Amino acid sequence: MMSKLGVLLTICLLLFPLTAVQLDGDQPADLPELRAQDFAPERSPWFDPVRRCCSQDCRVCIPCCPN
């Protein structure tokens, strides 16, 4: 029975190697607001062109101005 499980495990690892799974460290930053749209902060109504940052609503506009 154990040898059958070993063969099954070996076949599974050959078909789906663990290196094919991306780990959390390999993932880009998860910013759903940025993924949902083609984001350009310069087009945001909160973007301050003089300071080159967003003055309000830092949840959707990045980079956020320090207060």
Swiss-Prot record:
Q: Name one Pfam family in it.
A: Conotoxin
The 4-hydroxyproline modification is found at P63
Q: Which residues form the signal peptide?
A: 1-20
The alphabetical list of record keywords is:
Cleavage on pair of basic residues, Disulfide bond, Hydroxylation, Neurotoxin, Secreted, Signal, Toxin
Propeptide, chain numbering: 21-50
The record's comment about this protein's domains reads:
The cysteine framework is III (CC-C-C-CC). Classified in the M-2 branch, since 2 residues stand between the fourth and the fifth cysteine residues.
Q: Where in the cell is it found?
A: Secreted
The GO cellular component terms are: extracellular region
Q: Which organism is it from?
A: Conus tessulatus
Where are the disulfide bridges?
C53-C65, C54-C61, C58-C64
Alphabetized GO MF terms: ion channel inhibitor activity; toxin activity
Q: In which tissues is it expressed?
A: Expressed by the venom duct.
Highest taxon in the source lineage: Eukaryota
Q: Which InterPro entries match?
A: 4Fe4S_Fe-S-bd, Conotoxin
Q: Which family does it belong to?
A: Belongs to the conotoxin M superfamily.
Its protein name is Conotoxin TsMMSK-B021
Q: What is its main location?
A: secreted
